[in-house]
């Protein structure tokens, strides 16, 4: 049986990575000549657009509806390592936006500032969802898990 992915480990450790990558992209755009006001504006615009796009969808509410129906599992079920889970959470979104930011830097540093803002927005949205996930788990005394990939089935184990 394939090891499960702990959702808390999937969503939380990638947050500082995304934020740092976003700030590095902003600093690089500034170093390549984007004015302070334009770079901050573009960075904020990218973060705001991503945040609004993600926080106004029904995905979060449907996730927690599915979480309420999570299949109970015991401690014997294998769980993927934290390092592997971190790598999984970076692909493809964090890696793709980081690569696009790096590609845009020498071509259009203003676009890179916008993309860096999207990375920061990913961190902000992830922290909102991460907070909701931790609160949900703590109120129920469980940890949520999923199969690797795009599996929709969720599993719950009593918190230790």
Spans of model-derived segments:
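Alpha-helical transmembrane segments and their immediate juxtamembrane interface regions
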Residues: 115-151
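Membrane-water interface of transmembrane alpha-helices
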Residues: 51-71, 132-138
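Alpha-helical transmembrane segments and their membrane-interface junctions
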Residues: 24-38, 90-122
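N-terminal first transmembrane alpha-helix
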Residues: 1-63
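Select subsegments of transmembrane alpha-helices in polytopic membrane proteins
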Residues: 10-20, 82-96
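Structural signature of transmembrane alpha-helix termini at the membrane-water interface
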Residues: 27-31, 55-59, 103-106, 127-135
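N-terminal juxtamembrane cytosolic/stromal segments of multi-pass membrane proteins
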Residues: 1-10, 141-160
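Short membrane-interface loop/juxtamembrane segments of multi-pass integral membrane proteins
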Residues: 67-90
């Amino acid at each position: 049986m394939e090891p499960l992915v702990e959702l808390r480990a999937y969503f939380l450790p990638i947050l500082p990575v995304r934020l740092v990558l976003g700030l590095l992209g902003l600093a690089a755009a500034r170093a390549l000549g984007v004015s302070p006001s334009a770079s901050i504006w573009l960075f904020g615009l990218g973060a705001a657009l991503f945040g609004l796009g993600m926080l106004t969808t029904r995905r979060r509410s449907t996730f927690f509806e599915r979480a309420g129906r999570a299949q109970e599992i015991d401690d014997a079920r294998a769980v993927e390592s934290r390092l592997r889970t971190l790598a999984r959470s970076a692909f493809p979104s964090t890696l793709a936006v980081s690569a696009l930011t790096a590609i845009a830097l020498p071509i259009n540093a203003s676009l890179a500032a916008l993309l860096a803002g999207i990375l920061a927005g990913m961190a902000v949205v992830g922290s909102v969802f991460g907070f909701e996930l931790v609160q949900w788990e703590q109120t129920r005394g469980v940890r949520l898990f999923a199969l690797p990939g795009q599996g929709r089935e969720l599993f719950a184990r009593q918190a230790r």
